[in-house]
Amino acid sequence: MPYQIKQINREDICFSDNLLEINNCPQNLYYIGNINILNTKAISIVGKRNASTKGKYYAYLIAKKYASQGFTIVSGLAKGIDQFAHIGALSVNGKTIAVLGNGLSKIYPEENTKLAKEIIKKNGLIITEYETNEKPNTQNFPKRNRIISGLSISTIIIEADEISGSLITGRYAIDQNRELYTIPWKLNLEKNFQSGCNLLIKEGITPITKI
């Protein structure tokens, strides 16, 4: 990424108050973009990479709705649900933060480099706890998810398998005493995109019934 990568630590006045409350809060964050939105009222929207068309649409609509109300939309810049959450926020010139599981020398996935540039152009923010040249690593992404939920007052899971990174984010939200919501689905038994969402509802998580 041809941008200046800067660093912020927990003692900085711009650091997120919400993030300071969580267990294992990162000591440092590396960032590109508008650091002033890090400590704003935020909602995280997450879900499957291999998302359904309806799931992507819901992510877009929900992000657009809350961004237009002044909330910052937080997600992970992954393809699928994350991608459309960021796009929904940008569609109303809203604030959005992308939290990566790798260093900022490269955007992952590479196909979302254009979206990352659009986030920066529109005064959004891209952050990570990993040093500049740290490559994407499967172990980094679940750990990254605590930051996504930790920045936010609420997390919304759009689509998720019963074993998934999105449910890890949801568990973090619960552990952090943050609100957690999900979408009730009539299951597509062939692809089983949303079984994790319905599992959360069975466990008592509040469903979003009107979008």
Specify the residue positions occupied by each region the protein language model found.
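Glycine-biased, small-residue-rich flexible motifs in mid-sequence functional cores and linkers
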Residues: 3-211
